[in-house]
């Protein structure tokens, strides 16, 4: 073998290793340069505000739903939705720590768990929304036939399936996220980053496609079909009301209107989820494409703001829910605090109204 061939053969593994390092996305690790403190302060302010609003909103929504005397399947699923939001925002302190230190100094365990828990909570959220829409559609059909809804054991099984499937679906992220040294643009030396390293490109492609399909598109299709069916039932019920004004019929319509109000709220939650989670899904797919197109540049700062936008969904969910379904409860709380006598009157008059609520029945 000629010296030129031997030198080329020896340099090939180095070039391959250098290319592999260049394709590793650093996610939250980023060298910000001279304005590091200012940028980190802005990022901290934004995420801290999202964290505070989300924590307060979800905890208050949890208390309002949990204090109802009767909690059905829908209420349990809504509680599950708020729990998933709380799990999702638990990643914010870790994200802020990395944005301040730039390098990953939290250890391998946190690296394995951070993106795993974020993906797990997102999967639980969309599956819960799909389960609520499907359960409400089935409940309305069974209500018209005089059939009772699922019992406590069925609810426990449903929640176990949602969390179990989400945990298994996100498991590859827990396995393949690891801490590696890498030199980032603007850095004088290598720093530790938490990045995703798949054994094969084929495995990464198959997981990305299957996860987006099964945990994003299919639940969205279930929600759309369920809402379409409920709209058909609601329109048919209103037409029957114009023909017959019997008490039983009017009572059935009142329940349908409450269901329609609940579905309108859940529809808003679903729309906000898809709007605020679509950018992160697209960004993850672009990171996958980066393996094939080296000229495609995705900055870690852009990834951070996309994730921050996704975090904001956890703050928006309880706001939408409280504004549309819990306005009377919040009015009662404020009146009890500022006007005790008026609050007592509202408390007495709202008992029967709460008993008629489908979400608590």
Swiss-Prot record:
Places the protein is found: Cell membrane; Endosome membrane; Lysosome membrane; Cell projection, Cilium membrane
Q: Where are the transmembrane segments?
A: 46-66, 78-98, 113-133, 157-177, 205-225, 269-289, 296-316
> In which domain of life is the source organism classified?
Eukaryota
Question: Is Disulfide bond one of the keywords?
Answer: yes
User: Which Gene Ontology BP terms does the record give?
Assistant: adenylate cyclase-activating G protein-coupled receptor signaling pathway; brown fat cell differentiation; ghrelin secretion; inflammatory response; negative regulation of apoptotic process; negative regulation of cytokine production; negative regulation of inflammatory response; negative regulation of somatostatin secretion
Q: Name one GO cellular component term.
A: cilium
Q: Which residues are glycosylated?
A: 21
Query: Which keywords describe this protein according to UniProt?
Result: Cell membrane, Cell projection, Differentiation, Disulfide bond, Endosome, G-protein coupled receptor, Glycoprotein, Inflammatory response, Lipid-binding, Lysosome, Membrane, Phosphoprotein, Receptor, Transducer, Transmembrane, Transmembrane helix
The record places the following residue ranges in the Extracellular compartment, namely 1-45, 99-112, 178-204, 290-295
Q: Kindly state the tissue distribution recorded for this protein.
A: Highly expressed in lung and colon.
Entry-annotated residues carrying Phosphoserine: 350, 357, 360
**Membrane topology category:** Multi-pass membrane protein
Q: What is its main location?
A: membrane
Topological domain (Cytoplasmic) residues are 67-77, 134-156, 226-268, 317-361
Q: How is it modified after translation?
A: Phosphorylated at two clusters of Ser and Thr residues located in the intracellular C-terminus. Prerequisite for FFAR4 internalization via an ARRB2-dependent pathway.
Positions of post-translational Phosphothreonine modification: 347, 349
Q: List the disulfide bonds in this chain.
A: 111-194
One of the entry's Gene Ontology molecular-function terms is:
G protein-coupled receptor activity
Return the PANTHER family for the record: FREE FATTY ACID RECEPTOR 4-LIKE, LEUCOKININ RECEPTOR-RELATED
Function in brief: G-protein-coupled receptor for long-chain fatty acids (LCFAs) with a major role in adipogenesis, energy metabolism and inflammation. Signals via G-protein and beta-arrestin pathways. LCFAs sensing initiates activation of phosphoinositidase C-linked G proteins GNAQ and GNA11 (G(q)/G(11)), inducing a variety of cellular responses via second messenger pathways such as intracellular calcium mobilization, modulation of cyclic adenosine monophosphate (cAMP) production, and mitogen-activated protein kinases (MAPKs).
Per UniProt, subunit arrangement is: Interacts (via C-terminus) with ARRB2 following LCFAs stimulation.
* Family, as annotated: Belongs to the G-protein coupled receptor 1 family.
Please identify the protein, giving its name as recorded. Free fatty acid receptor 4
């Amino acid at each position: 073998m000629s010296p030129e061939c031997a030198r080329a053969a020896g340099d090939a593994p180095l070039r391959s290793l250098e290319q592999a390092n260049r394709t590793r996305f650093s996610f939250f690790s980023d060298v910000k340069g001279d304005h590091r403190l200012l940028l980190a302060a802005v990022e901290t302010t934004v995420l801290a505000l999202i964290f505070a609003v989300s924590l307060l909103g979800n905890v208050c929504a949890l208390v309002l739903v949990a204090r109802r005397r009767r909690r059905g399947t829908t209420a349990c699923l809504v509680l599950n939705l708020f729990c998933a939001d709380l799990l999702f925002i638990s990643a914010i302190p870790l994200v802020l720590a990395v944005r301040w230190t730039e390098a990953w100094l939290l250890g391998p365990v946190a690296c394995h768990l951070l993106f795993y828990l974020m993906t797990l909570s997102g999967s639980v959220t969309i599956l819960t929304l799909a389960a609520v829409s499907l359960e409400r559609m089935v409940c309305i059909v069974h209500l018209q036939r005089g059939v009772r809804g699922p019992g406590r054991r069925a609810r426990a099984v449903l929640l176990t399936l949602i969390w179990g499937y989400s945990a298994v679906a996100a498991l590859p992220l827990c396995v393949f996220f690891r801490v590696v040294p890498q030199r980032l643009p603007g850095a004088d030396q290598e720093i530790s980053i938490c990045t995703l390293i798949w054994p094969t490109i084929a495995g990464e492609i198959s997981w990305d496609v299957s996860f987006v399909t099964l945990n994003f598109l299919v639940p969205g299709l279930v929600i759309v079909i369920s809402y379409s069916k409920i709209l058909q039932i609601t329109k048919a019920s209103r037409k029957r009301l114009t023909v017959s004004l019997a008490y039983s019929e009017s009572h059935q319509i009142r329940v349908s209107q409450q269901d329609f109000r609940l579905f309108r709220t859940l529809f808003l939650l679903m729309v906000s989820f898809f709007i605020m989670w679509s950018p992160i899904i697209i960004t993850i797919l672009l990171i996958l494409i980066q393996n094939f197109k080296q000229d495609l540049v995705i900055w870690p700062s852009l990834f951070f703001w996309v994730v921050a936008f996704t975090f904001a969904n956890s703050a928006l969910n309880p706001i939408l829910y409280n504004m549309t379904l819990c306005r009377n409860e919040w009015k009662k709380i404020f009146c009890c605090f500022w006007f005790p006598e008026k609050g007592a009157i509202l408390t007495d008059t709202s008992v029967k109204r709460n008993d008629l609520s489908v979400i608590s029945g």
